[in-house]
Amino acid sequence: MAKGTRKPRQPRRVAVRFASRMKGRKKTLWQRRYRGSVKAPNMTMRVRRPLKGTLRKKIRSYATPSKKVKNTREPNCFLRSCAREKLNQSRKRYQNMRQSQRRGQNQKRR
């Protein structure tokens, strides 16, 4: 049996989304960085290390896409119109009741 050659172990690498800042400006995801004549994706690589107490920022394990915020669903026009009609009916009923009370009070005064 011959001895097999082993490949040297490489540290696990993790993709981080944003490139380093150049002149205080953050590169956006759709801008590409050129390395020589080859177009390379805008990703920097960091080695994953165990977190220490002094380390504040966590190294992301993967680049997550930003989630779109969902808008709350509004009731459709049919429900809106029904609610408006009911509100108007109750308002009219209340106004009629107040008017009839005023009429009764006016008749008592005379």
Curated annotation (Swiss-Prot):
Q: What does this protein do?
A: Involved in nuclear basic protein transition: histones are replaced by spermatid specific proteins which are themselves replaced by protamines in late spermatids.
Database matches in InterPro entries:
Spermatid_TP
A GO CC annotation recorded here is: nucleus
User: Origin, by domain of life?
Assistant: Eukaryota
An example GO biological process term is: spermatogenesis
For this chain, one GO molecular function annotation is: DNA binding
* Residue numbers spanned by region Disordered: 80-110
The UniProt entry lists the main location of this chain as: nucleus
Per the database entry, which stretches of residues form a coiled coil?
none
Q: Where in the cell is it found?
A: Nucleus; Chromosome
Q: Which organism is it from?
A: Ovis aries
This one is known as Spermatid nuclear transition protein 3
Listed A to Z, the keywords are:
Chromosome, Developmental protein, Differentiation, DNA-binding, Nucleosome core, Nucleus, Spermatogenesis
